[in-house]
Amino acid sequence: MRMKQLYAPTLKETPSDVETVSHEYLLRGGFIRKVAAGIYTYLPLGRRVLLKIENIVREEMNRIGAQEILMPILQPAELWKRSGRWDDYGPEMMKLKDRHERDFTLGPTHEEIVTDLVKNELRSYRQLPLVVYQVANKYRDEIRPRFGLLRAREFIMKDAYSFHSSWESLDETYELFKEAYSRIMERLGVKYMVIEAETGAIGGNASHEFVVPAKIGETNVLYCEKCGYQASDEKAEYRGEYPVEEEEEKPLEKVPTPGVRTIEEVSQFLGVPPSKIVKSLLFVGRDGYVMALIRGDLELNEAKLKSHLKDQSLRLATPEEVLKDFGVPIGFIGPIGTNVKKVADHSIKGLKNFVVGGMEKDTHYVNANHPRDFKVDEWCDLRTVVEGDPCPVCGEPLRATKGIELGHIFKLGTKYSEAMEAYFMDENGEMKPFIMGCYGWGVSRTMAAVVEHFHDENGMIWPLSIAPYTVIVDILNMNDPDQKRVGEEIYRALLEKGEEVVLDDREVSPGFKFKDADLIGFPIRINVGRSLKDGVIELKKRYSKELVKVSIQNGLGSLFEALNRMKAEYDPREAIE
């Protein structure tokens, strides 16, 4: 490919809506162009990277015996209603109606479609296990698309699904996917973590995420340097001890707290620490209102609450709903005299004489106690674990970091097969629901994550495995006939050897060419410039300042040898260490 022909419109200036390095460089480097918020066109360079990522993923899927299919993006609501997720999935699901007023969705995932497919085809345990996958577009109506490809409304994903006759079979396939995903990460060359994760709207009883550490990552990771425990903050368990207060219970008292709503305001106004206040948070779910209770100095983990109640539709009640149904502003809600289900974190078990909302505007109760003043229906761990909390395995203080999720795998069990009546006949002639797993990989976000991982102040630093082109040949002076002739010879010779090479034959300054080459991130640059008069050309790794001079007076053999050595040594991790 010649730069004169390559459709890669680079930008000197950074677009105003850019928030991340990957978003900036992919736009400026001519890899993507924005169509609307969270929707992008992939230009030739971006498409080449995507195809290479897809090929790596396909190779690893095929290696473990998964078979590729392609399912429709447009999915009928009937299947989602059958699984119970039409309402549970939330506002991120893109819904639409056809001309006959029938409901459809642009698929964010394909559990319903694939389960319906298999239930009509597989009848016997002898046909199991089955593993299928696809690489296709997915859709999420993000409330605020941001970070370029990292939180988009349309994105490319590999999703795989497995069907089994036993849990042991699912466990074996689950481990195969863990190994396959680890190999994908190794081939990308990035640092990564495999963490325990919450199952969320997908469901199931076990889940792991594969994340790339990054400052702008949206996955909060807790990890233990001693025992190796790793989990998302949604999943991380708190197993520390809570103090049991020995003080005597005091009489309950309602006190005026005019205009005091937040934990901080209540703490200052009443002169009590936040740990002596109980937060009361009202949620609306499938079965109505639920009140979650937790100590005032801790943060409630909504994912844990949803998991405990097995209700992914759960959401915080709005101030308008609370005022309408309880007759009190939201800042004064409390558990006393409230006839709703109450789920409490273990942190309040040992509390005595604490503060709660007064269920009346501008009032709070002091010296509240349970079970004297209110009943807790269910106890569970609702606390968001933070850095410094004890590791649930060994007790050492946990460390925290952020990461970009690329892969997510789930043991679904029989959630979908039972809901959709997908059964097979086992070896005893009994009808049993399929035991399922599902396994996602974000293809388009992988491109952004790699850029976040490998870049410098000049642009992207692609690993060889997914670089759009491996080599760029820069003719530094297009008016020099010798440079032009030799540059063309090198370009044609590399093409004949099967190298993915670009020839920069534009009539622009060397500095302009170098800046574009660095911005785009070609792994290896070959300079054909003034040193050619001495029979010498230069090779340079994208992340290195060192120029390797190679004599070509006796032909191009020495160039090919130097290039092969440089490719063998090429490791963009050197740029970030």
Curated annotation (Swiss-Prot):
Catalyzed reactions per annotation:
tRNA(Pro) + L-proline + ATP = L-prolyl-tRNA(Pro) + AMP + diphosphate
Q: Which domain of life is it from?
A: Bacteria
SUPFAM superfamilies per the record?
Class II aaRS ABD-related, Class II aaRS and biotin synthetases, YbaK/ProRS associated domain
GO BP: prolyl-tRNA aminoacylation
Swiss-Prot/TrEMBL domain comment: Consists of three domains: the N-terminal catalytic domain, the editing domain and the C-terminal anticodon-binding domain.
Q: Per the similarity annotation, which family is this?
A: Belongs to the class-II aminoacyl-tRNA synthetase family. ProS type 1 subfamily.
Functional summary from the UniProt entry: Catalyzes the attachment of proline to tRNA(Pro) in a two-step reaction: proline is first activated by ATP to form Pro-AMP and then transferred to the acceptor end of tRNA(Pro). As ProRS can inadvertently accommodate and process non-cognate amino acids such as alanine and cysteine, to avoid such errors it has two additional distinct editing activities against alanine. One activity is designated as 'pretransfer' editing and involves the tRNA(Pro)-independent hydrolysis of activated Ala-AMP.
**What is the protein name given in its UniProt record?**
Proline--tRNA ligase
Q: Which organism is the protein's source?
A: Thermotoga neapolitana (strain ATCC 49049 / DSM 4359 / NBRC 107923 / NS-E)
Specify the taxonomic lineage: Bacteria, Thermotogati, Thermotogota, Thermotogae, Thermotogales
